[in-house]
Amino acid sequence: IVNQDGLAGLVSVRCDLTVTNAYRGEDLAGLAGLRRCESLCIGSAGAPNETLKRIELPALREVAGDLQLCGTAVRSVVFAALQRVDGAFAVGSDALVEIVADELESVGGDLRLAGSTGNAAKAPCEQMYFPELQRVGGELSVARFGKLGQLATTFGALVSVGSIAYEELALTASCEFPLIETVGAVALTDCPALRTISLPRLAAAGSFS
């Protein structure tokens, strides 16, 4: 299977939408009209997608469950209209250059962003930005990005989060969350370039390390 043009009229999926390695295309152009699904799964840690280079779903506004993307070749992830993910939102790619979710306001579960499908940082991504993101119900995790230097304003609108974890970020110089008042835990691990930690409104934390 190399294209999904036959699904061009698909607007909603009541249950799960899963893209397995049987699909050998480089993009998801055939799903451009999709507005809502229960969950979206493309690849997994045990079997990452190997051919997709661009994941763009311009009409998708809501995912009622989990949104999971895992691929060795994915360079671009673009959700121009996505406003909420009620479950977990996870992106892992060895080749990630950009991730765009400018309208995303809420993630009900964990938000996990990884610059690798394995244990070593590989993705060349240098910056990411979530300008409207206000709430993450679980853990916010950014891990294994060797070139990600700019995170100062990435989560500037975030008001509520369960916990924060930065791990193996070789060039990240700052950890800044200007609006967070309480957090379960903050863990900053293997971030040798980190110079600035700023949570000016933080009043209570379960742990800080």
Question: What residue ranges belong to the model's regions?
Answer:
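Concave beta-strand-loop units of leucine-rich repeat
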Residues: 1-30, 36-56, 62-78, 83-98, ...
